[in-house]
């Protein structure tokens, strides 16, 4: 199913990064010199009319400063009531702020998958309401979602924390990708070497 709708990006950059030892969003790539949040945003910008970066209250100001001159990038802080709900809370905060984009597809990427390429993201953009899947597992945070603010709000009020619950409610389907290595989620710095 070819996608003809507007795409909006969501970069999930509000995680605690406790196992990583420093905020993953600001970890600098040795090759490009850019932070992981900058790299993730740069992969979405060619495909998206707007990119929203989901931030926690600790990194919000630094992210605003980093992207201050970019009119197509907006930093969205976690909603206080749902700040401990992980990625689901971040996606909700963005969709609440993105009410003008109710007809858009939302391309969701976590900041800690630095090996994802424009090729995989471009393919995902062609398949509305799908998430990435490889032989080794489901990658629920690499997804092309419909606007789902009401569903998210309901899940959060039920104290649901699982992204999978959102995908089930939206009838989101898996999209198979062959290259496992590009979908590596980095939780420890030693996984980079």
Report residues per predicted region.
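Nucleotide and nucleotide-moiety/phosphate-recognizing core
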Residues: 2-139, 147-160, 168-182
């Amino acid at each position: 199913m070819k996608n003809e709708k507007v795409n909006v990006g969501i970069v999930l950059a509000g995680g605690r990064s406790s196992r990583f030892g420093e905020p993953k969003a600001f970890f600098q790539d040795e090759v490009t010199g850019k932070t992981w949040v900058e790299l993730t945003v740069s992969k979405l910008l060619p495909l998206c009319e707007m990119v929203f970066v989901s931030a926690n209250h600790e990194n919000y100001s630094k992210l605003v400063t980093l992207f201050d001159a970019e009119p197509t990038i907006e930093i969205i802080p976690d909603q206080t009531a749902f700040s401990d709900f992980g990625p689901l809370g971040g996606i909700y905060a963005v969709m609440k702020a993105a009410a003008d984009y109710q007809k858009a597809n939302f391309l969701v990427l976590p900041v800690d998958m630095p090996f994802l390429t424009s090729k995989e993201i471009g393919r995902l953009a062609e398949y509305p309401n799908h998430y990435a899947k490889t032989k080794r597992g489901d990658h629920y945070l690499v997804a092309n979602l419909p606007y789902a603010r009401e569903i998210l709000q309901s899940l959060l009020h039920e104290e649901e924390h699982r992204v999978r619950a959102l995908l089930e409610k939206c009838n989101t389907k898996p999209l198979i990708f062959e290259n496992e290595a590009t979908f590596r989620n980095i939780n420890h710095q030693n996984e980079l070497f």
